[in-house]
Design a protein with these regions (language model features):
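Short glycine-enriched loop/turn motifs at secondary-structure junctions
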Residues: 1-4, 60-66
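Vicinal oxygen chelate
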Residues: 12-16, 62-63, 68-114
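Core segments of cupin and vicinal oxygen chelate
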Residues: 2-3, 9-51, 78, 85
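Short, charge-rich, low-complexity interaction segments located
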Residues: 50-58
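Short, flexible, glycine/charge-rich loop motifs used to bind or transfer phosphoryl groups or to couple energy/partner
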Residues: 42, 58-60
Length: 114
């Protein structure tokens, strides 16, 4: 039996700003649906089988409360250059990854502010 993580829900304070941020990083917008009291946006990073969703009425969690979500890349320097080229503020290095995860991630982790 295959078990696959499909979606992670991120609480955000400004749906349009969050959508612009992820679009600016080159993430694919899979959905942007709304009704009278709700809106859901789903975006997926290039090459990822897992997406994130955010919106209005999607979760009761506080904006910014999600912790411990990681994107892993094969080449951190190339990924950083691509993100900076798209206007992202990449905080590098992110030493907590090296202390906490050590060998498992090595030089494949960075923090992106947005």
């Amino acid at each position: 039996m295959d078990l696959q993580l499909e979606v992670v829900v991120l609480p955000v304070s400004d749906v349009d700003r969050a959508k612009r941020f992820y679009e600016s990083l080159g993430w694919r917008v899979d959905a942007d649906f709304s009704g009278p009291d709700w809106r859901v946006v789903q975006v997926t990073p290039p090459g990822s089988p897992c997406s994130i969703q955010f919106g209005t009425g999607v979760t009761s969690a506080a904006p910014g409360s999600v912790q411990g979500t990681f994107l892993v890349v094969d080449d951190i320097q190339a990924a950083r250059a691509a993100l900076v080229g798209r206007g992202a503020d990449v905080i590098h290095p992110f030493p907590a990854f090296n202390r906490v995860l050590g060998e498992s991630l090595g030089e494949r982790a960075a923090q992106v502010a947005g």
